C-alpha cells in the first residue's frame, strides 16, 4: 500500500531472526510469490500446504527445505510468523480470519472477500488482533503506476475530474473455479476490475463514492442478477464526492489484437497522465504526462514488480508493524465491487 524500497542487505545486517512463513496454496501465483520471497533472503519458507501432491512437489523445487503439511490447522500450529494465502477466492476471508485470530499476520491474494461484508469481517479481525494485513494489489507496486500517483499527488495536473481505466485479458483464467460464482464471487470484475477500482480510488485519495452504474455481459449476452454465470465483459461508471467520474472497462477472452490491454488515464484541470502496458505485455508498462498535445515520459524500461507487494508486507512485518488503518481502503474497494454487481442486477 504505497511506495517501497527493499534493501535485503540492510535487513540482513541487523542479524535479526528471519520470519518463518507458511504458504497456503502454491499454484502458479502462490508459487511465484513464494519464489520472490525465497530469493529475497528476507524470510524463511518454512511450511507449505496445498491440496495437490503434484503442486506441492513443484513448490519444493523452489524451497526444498520447507516442511509440507496436509491441513491448514497443521500450518497454523507449525510455529510460523506469518501466512501467505493463495487459494480460491471463496476461501480467502475465512482463512484470513483464522490466521489473524491465531495471532498471525496475513498476506492474501485478491480479493480478500467476495463481498464487502466478507472483506469488512477480515479487516475487523485484523483490527481486533492488532495484526498486519495486506492483499496482493500488485499493480500499485509497478514503477509506472507509482510515477502517475506521484504526479497526481504533487498537484501538477490540477484538480483531477476524470479517469478512464481498462483491463482486457484476451485469455481469461484457466482454472474452472473462476467461472463458478459461489467460489469466485464474480467474473472479470472481481478478477481484473478490482485492480482498476483500487488504482482509481488510490489516485484520487479515496473520495466517497456517490453513485455506480454498470452493465455486465457473458459471451455477448446481457447478464443480470438472475443468472449464475459470471461476467466476461463489464463496464461501469463511478461518480465520487470529489466531483470526479471514473470509467471502468474489463474483460476476459475478448478479441483485442494482442494478449492484453491495461491502461489508466487521469485528466485534470492542468494536464493529464497515463499508465499503460507495452505491446500487449502483462508485465511491461510506461507512464506519461500530458500537456495539451505534448506527451512527457515519466518512466519506462524494465521493472521487476511481480511479488513486490509481498516484499513490502514482509519488510513491514520485520519492522514489527501491526494493524494498518489503511486496511479500511480494502473495504471501500469491495463496496464499489458490490455496487457494480448490484447496479447490473437491477437493469
Per-region residue spans from a language model:
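C-terminal helix-rich "cap/oligomerization" subdomain common to oxidoreductases
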Residues: 1-15, 74, 82-85, 131, ...
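N-terminal Rossmann-like dinucleotide-binding module
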Residues: 2-63
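Contiguous beta-strand/loop segments that form the cofactor/metal-binding neighborhood of enzyme cores
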Residues: 2-7, 198-280, 310-322
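Active-site loop of classical SDR/Rossmann-like NAD(P)-dependent oxidoreductases
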Residues: 51-54, 275, 299-311
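Beta-loop-alpha module in the N-terminal Rossmann-like domain of NAD(P)-dependent dehydrogenases
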Residues: 63-125
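Hydrophobic residues in well-ordered beta-strands that form the structural core
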Residues: 85, 108, 133-135, 248, ...
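Rossmann-fold dehydrogenase core element
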Residues: 119-139, 158-165
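Predominantly a Rossmann-like dinucleotide-binding segment in NAD(P)-dependent oxidoreductases
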Residues: 139-227, 347
